[in-house]
């Protein structure tokens, strides 16, 4: 496997074939984004990563996130689980014993969380 990140991501994306390279880049970026939101660096769960993915997508794409993800081959939260576990298998991400691909199944519906009036959690006004 190549040594630089971009080439490694390309290899993983090509080996699987279901998702665009940009989906892999975005998941990697979302992991970094999510970890930076923590007070103390630690392992994050699949659900925590999905929350970070949602917030980053709202920041970057807003209501167009569903369309962007669709172009990349992502149609449900389980697709992010497939990408994460492809990266785990390539030793580009780590997992704990408790982590499972199923942690990503049906966590939220894209059409519900990526609406025009949706904002990342950090940008919402307090209730």
Give, region by region, the residue ranges found by the protein language model.
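Non-transmembrane, aqueous-exposed alpha-helical and coiled segments at domain scale
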Residues: 1-127
């Amino acid at each position: 496997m190549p040594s630089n990140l971009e080439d490694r991501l390309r290899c993983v994306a090509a080996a699987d074939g279901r998702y665009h390279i940009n989906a892999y880049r975005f998941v990697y970026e979302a992991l970094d984004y999510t970890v930076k939101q923590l007070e103390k660096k630690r392992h994050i769960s699949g659900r925590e990563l999905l929350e970070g993915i949602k917030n980053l997508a709202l920041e970057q794409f807003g209501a167009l996130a569903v369309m962007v993800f669709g172009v990349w081959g992502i149609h449900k939260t389980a697709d992010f689980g497939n990408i994460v576990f492809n990266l785990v298998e390539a030793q580009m991400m780590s997992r704990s014993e408790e982590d499972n691909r199923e942690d990503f199944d049906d966590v939220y519906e894209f059409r519900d969380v990526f609406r025009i009036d949706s904002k990342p959690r950090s940008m919402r006004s307090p209730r």
